[in-house]
Regions:
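Hydrolase catalytic cores
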Residues: 177-178, 198-205, 225-229, 304-357
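Catalytic-core environment of secreted peptidases
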Residues: 189, 281-324
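C-terminal subdomain of the subtilisin-like protease fold in secreted/lumenal serine endopeptidases
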Residues: 211-243, 253, 265-269, 275-278, ...
Length: 357
């Protein structure tokens, strides 16, 4: 392809080769479906800067947009392990116990955890993992989804069926806040109570989140009604918005995102994209946590300051950040979805916003 040769391309391929264009341009509400079948990934070796390479590509007049592949970062700082595994003040703060009197979620509701990986052996997580019984581990892609043996989730960072954490256990802590088994006489409780979770590892062996937005798509394609993103960075991209559009408009998911920990009134992505539920961080006395981002992009806030959750090796530790606040809300979203099954993802998010104090 001439436009690709102009920048010394060594690889050009469809990002999502199994995707097809939507049958209709919009949904019943008039919202435009995202067409991910048109997205290509390109690698080049020339000495051109990324800005000049993009300019040359756009001169072809056949591209809608061209942009770098932004790699976000996780959004927390961990503390030391605690001896008291029941120290979960956030449940009282958000009135989780009262909510559970009305609805305790259901195993049919699945929360996608796009993060650094899972601990499938943790006794407070193991039973709440969403299992794919259509693709048991036998070396075959039994369900034909393009992912062989994705029985317990998927590792997009390493492209294998083991989403266990490697260098950063951030995802283990996040998973417990939304999805730790409740009412099992062990450890703490996830806000989603009976809701399941799907581990989607988006980090490579070094902990770099190289497949963050691809993780959102994977979760949306594999039955998750709620998708948690406890990561992000500064830099908007059309690709990122396209993925959010796909998850929320095409697939009717709710995407819940950490607002960031820079104590600024400014954009942080994916939290600042359209159709996302952005979550800020509050303290044990229900005030803004010092590092939490704030401003127009924040939709709701939840406790995320020294909150206790699961950690590898059957441990529980406290950690802080909007990374912790986000899964608290994601679990609550699962409860709302189960209480109002006809709601699409955006409606679940609106319900959370209008009922927050």
């Amino acid at each position: 392809v001439a436009f690709a040769n102009a920048v010394g391309v060594i690889n050009l391929h469809k990002k999502f080769p199994l995707d097809k264009s939507p049958e209709k341009p919009t949904n019943a509400a008039g919202q435009t479906y995202a067409d991910l079948s048109l997205i290509y990934e390109l690698n080049y070796t020339s000495t051109l800067s990324i800005e000049k390479a993009i300019s040359k590509l756009l001169l072809s007049n056949i591209l809608v947009y061209a942009e770098p592949h932004f790699i976000p970062k996780v959004t927390y700082s961990p503390n030391d392990p605690l001896a008291n595994p029941t120290d979960q003040y956030h449940l009282q703060t958000i009135n989780a116990f009262n909510a559970w009197n009305v609805n305790k979620g259901d195993s049919a509701i699945v929360i996608g955890i796009t993060d650094t990986g899972n601990d499938p052996t943790h006794p407070d997580l193991f039973n709440n993992i969403k299992r794919n019984y259509n693709d048991i581990v036998d070396g075959l892609d039994n369900d034909g989804d393009g992912y062989t043996d994705n029985y317990l989730g998927w590792d997009l960072g390493m492209n294998d069926n083991d989403p266990t954490w490697q260098t950063n256990a951030h995802g283990v802590h996040v998973s417990g806040l939304s999805s730790a088994s409740a009412d099992n006489n062990l450890g703490g409780a996830g806000t989603g109570f009976h809701c399941k979770y799907l581990p989607v590892k988006i980090a490579d062996a070094n902990g770099s989140l190289i497949a963050a937005y691809e993780g959102i798509k994977y979760a949306a394609d594999h039955g998750c009604q709620i998708i948690n993103c406890s990561w992000g960075g500064g830099g908007a991209s059309q690709y990122g918005q396209d993925i959010i559009d796909y998850a929320t408009i095409n697939k009717n998911c709710l995407v819940v995102c950490a607002a960031g920990n820079n104590n600024v009134d400014g954009d942080f992505f994916p939290a600042a994209y359209n159709y996302v539920l952005s979550v800020g961080n509050t303290t044990a006395i229900d005030t803004k946590q010092a590092s939490s981002n704030y401003g127009y992009m924040v939709d709701v806030c939840a406790p995320g300051d020294n909150v206790n959750s699961t950690w590898p090796g059957s441990f529980y530790v406290t950690s802080s950040g909007t990374s912790m606040s986000s899964p608290v809300v994601a679990g609550a979203a699962g409860i709302v979805k189960n209480q109002f099954p006809s709601y699409n993802g955006l409606q679940v998010g609106e319900r959370l916003k209008i009922t927050a104090d």
